Amino acid sequence: MLFNCQSLLVGISLISQALSAPILESRATAAASAFPDLHRAAQLSSAAYSGCRGNAFDVTITKRINDLLTGTDGFIGYSTEKKKISVIMRGSTSIVDLLNDIDIHLVTPSLSGVTFPPDVKIMRGINRPWSAIHDTVIAEVKSLIAKYPDYTLEAVGHSLGGALTSIAHVALAQNFPDKELTSNALAAFPIGNEAWANFAGSQPGTFNRGNNVLDGVPNMYSSGLVNFKHYGTEYYSSGSEASCVKCEGQRDRACSAGNGMYAVTIGHFSSFGITMLTAGCGRL
């Protein structure tokens, strides 16, 4: 949710504070070994903001994602170093993105290759942008699997990109059930109801939520009034390997749920040792 319209962001922050009142418990444990993969995810997420072409760190880009109507942006590629096929989603940089961030009207998703339970609902601000690119993403990943059949799959993104990663993970898991899949959604807000979280959390593969200290975005839409639900495993860090912890459940007070922050705060712009927009593309 990187955006330069300060007054709108302050407004969202105030709304989110009014809507967020979680019940918290603390059970986090040290998880330094998780930091390198989350650091790499942050590098790729930062690269998505930079409009990289050709390469983004270890990923060779094969297709840019850019849907003008919905503002959806990112890239798809592969890493010979990691033997991964990668779907990387960009966070917010425009008014269109910001409108997606706050469009919490619940809708029933419908995507090719995905069978949703009838009670699953997700926010329109995620359903609409992902639906615009879903078929393109699946087609490109399918093409790359044909070229690199032994590669695993990954989805990565920060902020709005992290929220889109939440649905990308399900789309990839359902369309390619025989492929190993790991997704890292950084600084993401929850996107759907409890039925959605239960369904998404039941998919094959690994879904991680990576959050930075003093970031309030993961706490958005998690109240009795809106009450969207996260899924997956949360990791929390102040930017160093030594500070990285694995959180227990979705509302561990030693992690983002207990930091007292809501919506866009100063901690939102850093992630696992990377300041968003500053990492470049990693390689010339």
Regions inferred by a protein language model and the residue ranges of each:
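Fungal secretory targeting signals
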Residues: 1-23
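Non-catalytic, mobile gating and regulatory segments of ester bond hydrolases
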Residues: 19-156, 160-284
